[in-house]
């Protein structure tokens, strides 16, 4: 039975944050003084597995593991393997900064991860450091991308948050890199999520401005729109030769009318909309001994409270991206 909200949207996709911690500090994601929650506040893998089983039973078929950085959570492959065995699970994917993929890519594939999205905001070492902090480098992320390709975690999607005057000049280089390696490259508009996200909105570039830079790099005739289903996400895709690029325009062309997703935070809150403050506590009833039927009722009630649209243009989200799972 499909999970349908009051606006007749089928909710089929859950983003699951397994950790608020991250080994990088990207300037649009978290401010330097921001501290992560204590691990004791996170759901255990046993608790998480029970909740994910309820979501699968209710009609969620696609799961994406996120963070923070999900690969800093020990024994993640064990969680994946258990999730992969659940009836109704169609796909498990992963969002990562790529730094730890050379170590874990093969095990993740064997456990049941189908594909990965990897963040790469700059190919230039100094630009990378300016955006992402002192940990990691473009070469280390590239190594993660190659490890994902070798392990068969495909298609590999590379996400670039585009900021005017910061990294927008690298768009042509990113397109070339994606074409050389057969990657799907996605450009993402900045969003006012958390203090860090609000601070970078002065560098906001719309998807139209981003696409214009792509056209300048490859020629207008070379950028061919792709129609038809391209997965459960909100990106609009274009073909450039044998590669693909996409744009995610949460600000300039929101996709709320077709939103199919919710988010489960590491501390057990169900976030109904990335741009709203609505959230439902699942950890407390879980730890107080709620039955499966009681958990199902809480989730079903939450789905009907999912808002019609985000309020990014009216107010910013106070929660940091690391606390929301992206």
Swiss-Prot record:
Q: Which residues bind [4Fe-4S] cluster 2?
A: 256, 259, 273
User: Which residues of the sequence carry a binding annotation for [4Fe-4S] cluster 1?
Assistant: 22, 26, 29
What Gene Ontology biological process does one annotation of this record name? Mo-molybdopterin cofactor biosynthetic process
**Which residues of the sequence carry a binding annotation for GTP?**
15, 64, 95, 157, 261-263
Task: Share what the entry says about its subunit structure, partners included.
Answer: Monomer and homodimer.
Record function comment: Catalyzes the cyclization of GTP to (8S)-3',8-cyclo-7,8-dihydroguanosine 5'-triphosphate.
* PANTHER family given in the database record: MOLYBDENUM COFACTOR BIOSYNTHESIS PROTEIN 1 (PTHR22960:SF0), MOLYBDOPTERIN COFACTOR SYNTHESIS PROTEIN A (PTHR22960)
- Its recorded name reads GTP 3',8-cyclase
Question: Taxonomic lineage of this organism?
Answer: Bacteria, Pseudomonadati, Pseudomonadota, Alphaproteobacteria, Magnetococcales
């Amino acid at each position: 039975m499909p999970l349908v909200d009051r606006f007749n949207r089928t909710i089929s996709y859950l983003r699951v944050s397994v950790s608020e911690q991250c080994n990088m500090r990207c300037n649009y994601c978290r401010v330097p003084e921001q501290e992560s929650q204590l691990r004791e506040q996170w759901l255990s893998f046993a608790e998480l597995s029970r909740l994910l089983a309820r979501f699968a039973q209710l009609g969620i078929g696609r799961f994406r593991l996120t963070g923070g950085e999900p690969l800093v959570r020990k024994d993640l492959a064990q969680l994946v393997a258990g999730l992969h065995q659940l009836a109704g699970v169609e796909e498990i994917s992963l969002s990562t900064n790529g730094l730890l993929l050379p170590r874990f890519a093969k095990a993740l594939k064997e456990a049941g991860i189908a594909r990965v999205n990897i963040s790469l905001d700059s190919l230039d070492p100094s630009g990378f450091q300016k955006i992402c902090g002192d940990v990691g480098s473009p070469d280390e992320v590239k190594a993660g991308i190659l490890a994902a390709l070798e392990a068969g975690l495909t298609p590999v999607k590379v996400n670039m948050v585009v900021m005017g005057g910061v990294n927008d000049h690298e768009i042509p280089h990113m397109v070339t890199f994606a074409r050389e390696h057969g990657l799907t490259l996605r450009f993402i508009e900045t969003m006012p999520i958390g203090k860090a996200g609000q601070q970078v909105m002065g560098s906001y570039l719309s998807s139209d401005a981003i696409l214009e830079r792509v056209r300048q790099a490859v020629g207008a005739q070379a950028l061919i729109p792709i129609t038809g289903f391209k997965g459960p996400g909100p990106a609009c895709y274009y073909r450039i030769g044998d590669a693909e690029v996409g744009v995610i325009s949460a600000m300039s062309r929101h996709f709320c009318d077709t939103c199919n997703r919710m988010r489960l935070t590491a501390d057990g809150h169900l976030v109904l909309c990335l741009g709203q403050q609505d959230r439902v506590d699942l950890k407390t009833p879980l730890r107080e001994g709620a039955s499966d039927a009681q958990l199902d009722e809480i989730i079903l009630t939450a789905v009907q409270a999912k808002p019609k649209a985000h309020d990014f243009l009216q107010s910013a989200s106070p929660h940091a991206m690391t606390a929301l799972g992206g």
